[in-house]
Amino acid sequence: MGGYKGIKADGGKVNQAKQLAAKIAKDIEACQKQTQQLAEYIEGSDWEGQFANKVKDVLLIMAKFQEELVQPMADHQKAIDNLSQNLAKYDTLSIKQGLDRVNP
């Protein structure tokens, strides 16, 4: 991966970040589905009363929050992919070569 004074990127770390971001995205989606299913199970069960309703409401709030994390996580993955691709090209950019001549 490319680099310039003050700009450092370790190719292995960027790849690790890509792998971890993919795992996190997958885990968030799985967790959201499980939370939603649990809320639906409670709603359809014989468990009734104020406490049951509060537990279900909390689970629905959690499921909504988890659902809202899906798009930002996808954006994060795209940003890491773009970083990886652009850093690989960094050393060949004419602006970088010009900066090297000005600031050796």
From Swiss-Prot:
It is found in: Secreted. It holds the Pfam family WXG100. SUPFAM superfamilies: EsxAB dimer-like. The keyword Iron does not apply. Its main location: secreted. InterPro entries: ESAT-6-like_sf (IPR036689), T7SS_ESAT-6-like (IPR010310). The keyword Calcium does not apply. Coiled coil: none annotated. Keywords: Secreted, Virulence. GO terms for cellular component: extracellular region. Belongs to the WXG100 family. Virulence factor that is important for the establishment of infection in the host. EsxB is required for EsxA synthesis as well as secretion. Mediates together with EsxA the release of S.aureus from the host cell. Also inhibits host cytokine production and thus modulates dendritic cell-mediated immunity. Homodimer. When mixed with EsxA does not form heterodimers. This is Type VII secretion system extracellular protein B. The gene is esxB.
